[in-house]
């Protein structure tokens, strides 16, 4: 239990390392700066200086945190309590604790459950406000992603560190009915159910039905076949149906953004996802770089609008 408490303590220190606004009861403590009238106290600076003892960096960090907290408070963003419940439960589980043990561990650290929940809520709101402020500034093109992904893959190969990534490719055929003024959801679903029944009963074949009825004319001319592809290349609902379908079994009618479908998985094989994996890594690197830059720019913008005063800097 002591080890679990130590692990949890480390987690709490990392998770809840937000600015602790010092009680105004410490009236005799020296004020080193103010941010829109909010004081920055000497004890806060000492608590944030760390081993390097960089006083100015500590003051700037506190000021930035105050500005972000103000932006959060002014945003009006609300967090669903159920989301906080989930995070609390997940935190306990990841630390190998029951809910009761987790509460005991919090108490051991001198932290009430309400305080812990409020800290989580503050961080979630802060993230939402920040993301809303900077999301429009993120601009990553497909060309940039592909080029960087290929460069990263080539470097990994030359260094002998490239690892092959595989995933399931599915061979799929489908029949699509598109909605129109003469065909609503109920009618399309009913028609596809009838087509499915006829195929299963042997009254027609999937290929013939696709050629006759499918509004995906390209695949319809090929018996409804879409060939082999990774599920991620399809619309979400289509991909989900592909993955959960048993090979050789025609799915029930389902709807996507394109219309109503039935599909059949006719083959499964392992495909090479190595290039795609490095493309994803490249995308994450580019986005994270821009995100950090945008975050810094956002905080700088908050500073420009704020009234910041230093005393005995």
From Swiss-Prot:
Keywords: Chaperone, Isomerase, Periplasm, Rotamase, Signal
Signal peptide location: 1-27
Gene Ontology molecular-function annotations: peptidyl-prolyl cis-trans isomerase activity; unfolded protein binding
Protein name: Putative peptidyl-prolyl cis-trans isomerase SurA
Catalytic activity: [protein]-peptidylproline (omega=180) = [protein]-peptidylproline (omega=0)
One cellular component (GO) term of this entry: outer membrane-bounded periplasmic space
Compartment(s) of residence: Periplasm
Top EC group: isomerase
PANTHER family named among the record's database cross-references: CHAPERONE SURA (PTHR47637:SF1)
Single GO biological process annotation from the record: chaperone-mediated protein folding
Pfam families on file: Rotamase (PF00639), SurA_N (PF09312)
Primary residence: periplasm
Keyword Nucleotide-binding attributed: no
Domain of life: Bacteria
Biological function: Chaperone involved in the folding of extracytoplasmic proteins.
Residue ranges constituting the PpiC domain according to the UniProt record: 167-267
Entry's EC annotation: 5.2.1.8
Disulfide bonds: none
């Amino acid at each position: 239990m002591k080890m679990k408490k130590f692990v949890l303590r480390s987690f709490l220190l990392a998770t809840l390392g937000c600015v602790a606004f010092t009680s105004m009861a410490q009236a005799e403590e020296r004020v080193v700066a103010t941010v829109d009238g909010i004081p920055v106290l000497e004890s806060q600076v000492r608590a944030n200086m760390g081993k390097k003892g960089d006083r100015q960096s500590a003051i700037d960090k506190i000021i930035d945190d105050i500005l972000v907290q103000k932006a959060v408070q002014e945003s009006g963003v609300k967090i669903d309590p159920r989301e906080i419940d989930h995070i609390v439960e997940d935190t306990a589980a990841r630390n190998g604790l029951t809910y009761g043990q987790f509460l005991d561990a919090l108490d051991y650290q001198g932290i009430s459950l309400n305080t812990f929940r409020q800290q989580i809520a503050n961080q979630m709101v802060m993230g939402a406000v920040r993301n809303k402020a900077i999301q429009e500034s993120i601009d990553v093109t497909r060309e940039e992603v592909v080029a960087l992904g290929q460069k990263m893959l080539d470097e990994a190969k030359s260094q002998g560190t490239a690892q092959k990534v595989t995933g399931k490719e599915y061979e799929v055929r489908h029949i699509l009915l598109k909605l129109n003024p003469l065909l609503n959801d109920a009618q399309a679903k009913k028609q596809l159910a009838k087509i499915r029944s006829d195929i299963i009963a042997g009254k027609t074949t999937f290929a013939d039905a696709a050629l006759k009825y499918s509004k995906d004319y390209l695949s319809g001319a090929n018996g409804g076949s879409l060939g082999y592809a990774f599920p991620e290349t399809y619309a979400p609902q289509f991909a989900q149906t592909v993955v959960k379908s048993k090979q050789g079994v025609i799915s029930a009618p389902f709807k996507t953004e394109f219309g109503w479908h039935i599909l059949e998985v006719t083959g499964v094989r392992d495909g090479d996802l190595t290039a795609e994996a490095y493309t994803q890594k490249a995308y994450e690197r580019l986005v994270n770089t821009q995100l950090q830059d945008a975050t810094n720019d956002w905080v700088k913008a908050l500073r420009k609008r704020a009234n910041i005063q230093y005393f005995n800097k």
